[in-house]
Amino acid sequence: MESGAYGAAKAGGSFDLRRFLTQPQVVARAVCLVFALIVFSCIYGEGYSNAHESKQMYCVFNRNEDACRYGSAIGVLAFLASAFFLVVDAYFPQISNATDRKYLVIGDLLFSALWTFLWFVGFCFLTNQWAVTNPKDVLVGADSVRAAITFSFFSIFSWGVLASLAYQRYKAGVDDFIQNYVDPTPDPNTAYASYPGASVDNYQQPPFTQNAETTEGYQPPPVY
């Protein structure tokens, strides 16, 4: 087991705040958290409007409720996930089990790759709905809508960077394991025993041997 596996410091050391804040994945994750906060705040705050003659609220993205729900959902989940993985990054050097580290890095890689794709879909979806929106339906909040679209676009790259960094950490951990792996080959000088605890003699008497008695010569029977 390597205590420094998967791109983390040696387990058991003291927490270094400066080193933690300068780690690439921590910086990228903080950027993702801010972008997600901006997206869902803009949609929640000014993504809904109503006509003068009605109090019924509707989504300003072409009155498509799915557009507002989708943008808000991926924004909230991205914010929560970013906060969670920031805590994991802070606690990661204290994890001495290489298997636990591997699973956390794989989870980070899969989630970051998935959210990169979801942000791309969200950007295309919101841009399309905003392009066909009737300007008369947007009484207020046009700037917030544009901000949500803009930071959805930026989030594609920030989460892509996170996925790339997670892959580099995973690959470094696998390469480190391969380099330090020792094949437990048996010692050829060690005798093999069929049963545990059985003693092995260096010399075994060959089968079917008899101890021959030597005769000094022929002795005739006594004569009476």
From Swiss-Prot:
The modification N-acetylmethionine is found at M1. The keyword Repressor does not apply. GO terms for cellular component: extracellular exosome; lipid droplet; membrane; neuromuscular junction; synaptic vesicle membrane. It is a multi-pass membrane protein. Induction: (Microbial infection) Up-regulated upon SFTS phlebovirus infection (at protein level). (Microbial infection) Interacts with SFTS phlebovirus protein NSs; may be involved in virus replication. Belongs to the synaptogyrin family. May play a role in regulated exocytosis. In neuronal cells, modulates the localization of synaptophysin/SYP into synaptic-like microvesicles and may therefore play a role in the formation and/or the maturation of this vesicles. May also play a role in GLUT4 storage and transport to the plasma membrane. (Microbial infection) May play a role in the assembly of cytoplasmic inclusion bodies required for SFTS phlebovirus replication. This is Synaptogyrin-2. The gene is SYNGR2.
